[in-house]
Amino acid sequence: MKFLKSNPFLALANNYMIDAPEPSNISYFWNFGSLLACVLVVQIVTGILLACFYVASMDLAFASVERIGRDVNYGFLLRALHANGASFFFIFLYLHIGRGLYYGSYRAPRTMTWNIGVIIFLLTIITAFLGYCLPANQMSFWGATVITNLLSAVPFIGDDLVQLLWGGFSVSNPTLNRFFSLHYLMPFVIAALSIMHLIALHTNGSSNPLGVTANMDRLPMNPYFLIKDLITIFIFLLAINYMVFYNPYGFMEPDCALPADPLKTPMSIVPEWYLLPYYAILRAIPNFQLGVVAMLLSILVLLLLPLLDFSAIRGNQFNPMGKFFFWCFVADFCILAWIGGSHPENVFITIGAYATAFYFIYFFILIPVYTILGNTLIDLGLPRSNK
């Protein structure tokens, strides 16, 4: 242990992972950070190995991906781990964000930690989309065509931006080269931001379910919380092994098994399941430009939460109104995911429009309203309690 504290590099790891003081009452909802770190390592390692065999060419990309699964030693394992690892990464990411929303982890003094996390979330979405396009299958080709066309919503220079991104007049070899290069780079950027996220977190320490400062009641990270983290990591390993060996393509669309055909449009163009809520928001607004703005705002609104929530009580643990509306928001988010994966028929478009409206009403109206109402009730109750 003395060596861990005397060596400057090991001392840094010791301060963050072994001797770090953590609130004694944090629950398993605080384990998603370690799970995300574990999955990120898996994604980087498998991604580097897959890149050794991938060919960024419209003619050979699909064949190279199939060859990885058929001819490369343990290639099927690498491919399944990488594909399903992305899904697990988003599962843990959404749960991590949901825990932060529920317990008010975006409130001061952890606003910087929250903002870095939102940037990581946005970059993760971009990285996932880039990787989704690389196999050059039927769904990814048309998904790349549709999503990259969103840049045409930029006034005056939109069409030029699309052609610059494509490297031509359609999704082709230059497009795959650009996407492959960026997809290889982005995980390392996310890893660097994750370290910044960790540094910002340890500046003021972790929050806790009670939402109060707990500087006097803390325990060292090792062994108490490391053992706790290992439990959820082992559960994750069991889950991803089940998906890899028993249902490796469970999260994929059937059209992902077909090579790209520029002359034939799929019956329904949908992104991966973890991007469906934002795709539903895009489709819910008839105006193209406003739909793109709404989709982007639905992510960036998380940066405004520290300003929108000024409640005297941190989090929803002791806030009945906040708790009720939070679970309404969770249900609304699930409805958006369902609508995003459905055919764009009138009934689904209508439901998506109402769900999209509630999504923004929750952030811009409900949170400030029940915050003001809650603060007012607290102010009215304080004189009575003092008496």
From Swiss-Prot:
CDD domains: Cytochrome_b_N. GO terms for molecular function: metal ion binding; ubiquinol-cytochrome-c reductase activity. Heme b b566 binds at H96, H197. A ubiquinone binds at H202. Its main location: mitochondrion. Belongs to the cytochrome b family. This is Cytochrome b.
